[in-house]
């Protein structure tokens, strides 16, 4: 299985928004308004200062995504990149999709001399914490 990782594009907005709705329900039991989420994803797509998406594709199908936000660190005189809003379609889990996205983020971070890459996981998302620690 070949996994292709790219930065999210306008044509990915709908699937990313659906992934976010699904992720919120699975991880936090939260019901999100799809239109609001779609508008939020669109806003980030149009302004990288709000966020940047990476998507994973298998055979042309988008099977996962994550959002990257940036935080300035005066301690390190550099940027921290925060990985958040990670979602992989259930049928593609435990196949290295997240790992592929993570490696793509880290490669880009290295090219841009980012101080640290960090992963945000909600404290109530016990399942996510277990996945990321493995």
Give short role names for the model-derived ranges.
Residues 78-90:
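Conserved acetyl-CoA binding element of GNAT-fold acetyltransferases
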Residues 88, 94-107, 133-134:
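Conserved acetyl-CoA-binding loop-helix of GNAT-fold acetyltransferases
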Residues 55, 61-70, 87:
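Conserved beta-strand in the GNAT
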Residues 43-55:
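A short helix-loop-beta-strand connector motif used in the catalytic cores of GNAT acetyltransferases and
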Residues 99, 115, 123-134:
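Conserved active-site alpha-helix within GNAT-family acetyltransferase domains
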